[in-house]
Amino acid sequence: MSILKQASLWLAGLLLLTGCGFTPKGQVINRADINSVYLSTPDPYGQLTREVEQQLRFAKIDILRHPDEHMVQLRVGSEQQSKRTISLYDNGQSAEYELGYGVQYQIIQPGKEPLSFTINIHRDFLENPQQALASSREAELILNEMREHAARRIIRRLTTLEP
């Protein structure tokens, strides 16, 4: 009886999760049915470009190397980074920063008006002046996380467009 009850609960939970459209983190479902896209970026070898390409591969979307007017085009603009002091120590040194990351991009579908979007991400960062090297490494890791998050948001928007 207990095994049957436990199996029923698992089945009910599974049906509930699949019924509401739940997908594991990082998994991209291509609802727009896009098979290939032309990717244009200011820095073809930059970190953001690599992140976007990786997310396109996860979504099983081929990347075209030459523009085609009959295919979807993804034009990613340059990255903007900012650093703003939020709080200070007693001696006047910065204690906490707000790191900002932004990128603009455009999705061009054949026969439709281009769609322009902006992504802005902000994270707080505590500065420890006694561990300057560790603090700069942590800031770099936070920037990479924001870049990865932006790439996921770009591809999520691309894969949920109306055909």
Enumerate the predicted regions with their spans:
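Bacterial N-terminal signal peptides that target proteins for export
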Residues: 1-9
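C-terminal motif of bacterial Sec signal peptides marking the signal peptidase cleavage site
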Residues: 17-19
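Surface-exposed short loop/turn segments
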Residues: 75-118, 124-140
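Bacterial signal peptide processing site
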Residues: 21-23
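Short, low-complexity, disordered segments immediately C-terminal to signal peptides
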Residues: 27-32
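N-terminal segment of the mature soluble domain
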Residues: 33-80
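C-terminal/domain-edge helix-coil "capping" segments
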Residues: 133-163
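Sec/Tat-exported extracytoplasmic proteins
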Residues: 56, 60, 107-111, 129, ...
